[in-house]
Every structure is written in C-alpha cells, then in structure tokens.
A protein has these predicted regions:
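Non-globular targeting/processing and membrane-anchoring segments
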Residues: 22-24, 31-77, 131, 153-156, ...
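Structural microenvironment flanking redox-active thiols in thiol-disulfide oxidoreductases
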Residues: 94-132, 145-148
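Short, internal strand/loop/helix patches
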Residues: 129-166
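Short active-site neighborhood of thiol/selenol oxidoreductases, capturing the structured segment around
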Residues: 72-94
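Short, glycine-anchored, charge-dense loop/turn motifs used at functional sites
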Residues: 67, 161-170, 174-175
C-alpha cells in the first residue's frame, strides 16, 4: 500500500473537551489538581490498569460514525476483533492509524473486524478520519463518561487490542509498538489465510516504539 505517511498538524486539534482516560495533555499545577480530582471521580483514580493479554474483553455497544450501532458480541460471532482507542489530538494515534488502515485493507472484513474507538465528538472524529484516510469503521465513546475506555482501563492512547473470537484479549498494546502491530498483522494473516501483504515499505523509517 503506497500511501504517504500523514504528518501531524498541530492546528487540527479541534475543540477542547474533557480529558478522557489515556489523555496526556499538559496542564498547569492548578489544572493538574482539578484534572486528577475529576479523573478519580469518573474513572476510578490513578490506579487504573489497561487490560492485558489473557483478560476477558468487556462487551460493548457503541454508535458508529456511519450511524449503525456496533456490538462487540455480534462482531465476535464472525471472528476476532481489533479495537483501537484513540484521541484526535494524539500525535502517536495519528502515526499509528495509517498502519492500522493498511492491516484493514489487507485483511479486514474477511473473518477479522477492525474498529477505531474515538474519545472525541463526531465532528472532530470525522475530520480525523478524513485527514488520515481511515477506511475502517470508527465508533464513538460517550465523551461525557467514556464508559468503554473506562471498562478497558485505558491509561494512554492509542491502546490497541486483539480480541480473540472467544472474547479473550490476546494482544494489548499501549502507545506505538512496531512489534505489536506486526503481531496483530500476523494474527490477521493467519486468521484470514490471505496472501501476505507488505505492512511497512522499505523506504519508510518506522519507529520501534513511541509512548502514547
């Protein structure tokens, strides 16, 4: 897939919203105290831990950008699911999503479902989808309570999960990890039985890791 890696545009952050789980916005000292109090009240405090491999993936139903609701349980009936949580202003999300889209174009829809889960409103999410040419389905977490982000214990975005058909999380990836993305692509290849496709082009300089 020969698309150019999109560049982060700091002017495209969109409107300000409550900080969701996984948001690492820089705050003033006063802002940090307010944010931490809010975080404890809404998301269970700083001891939240992202669900790891071997854990059961919480079921969820969320509205999709296309308008129809998405059910994890229903999707798993057809095969494994890749769920990628993101925030539009996160530069690491902006780096990761074009590669996730390559996985989707190579293997998605053939016994593997890939969805993005946005922590932003529909307008800002639509702008992100357009700017970074995201072609897989994108869902909207409730930006007032972030119930699904909370259920998965998000500490950073992007957070990407490979959920096996039995509902068990087999890959739990936080931030950008080349190794994890290659593992997810390998699982998608194995599940679909498709011909192997190039994930990273030889001319691309791919980071091994970037913190979310």
């Amino acid at each position: 897939m020969g698309e150019e890696q999109p560049r982060w545009n700091p002017s495209s952050h969109g409107t300000r919203q409550k900080n969701p789980p996984g948001c690492e916005d820089h705050l003033t000292s006063k802002g940090q105290n307010v944010a931490m109090k809010w975080f404890k009240n809404i998301f269970g405090g700083p001891n939240m831990t992202t669900l790891t491999a071997g854990k059961k993936a919480p079921d969820f139903n969320l509205p999709a950008m296309a308008g129809k609701d998405f059910s994890l349980r229903d999707a798993l009936a057809g095969g494994p699911v890749v769920a990628a949580f993101f925030k539009v202003s996160c530069p690491v999300c902006q780096y990761a999503f074009p590669f996730l889209d390559r996985i989707y174009k190579n293997y998605g829809g053939r016994n593997v479902t890939l969805v993005g889960i946005s922590q932003n409103d529909k307008k800002d999410t639509a702008a992100f989808v357009k700017q970074f040419n995201v072609t897989f389905p994108v869902l909207l977490d409730d930006i007032n309570k972030f119930p699904v982000s909370n259920a998965y214990g998000l500490t950073n975005v992007p957070s990407i999960f490979w959920i096996a058909q039995d509902g068990e999380i087999e890959v739990s990836s936080v931030g950008w990890s080349r190794k994890d993305i290659e593992q997810i692509a390998g699982k998608a290849l194995e599940t679909t039985g498709e011909t192997p496709q190039i994930l990273f082009r030889p001319d691309e300089k791919i980071a091994d890791f970037r913190a979310g």
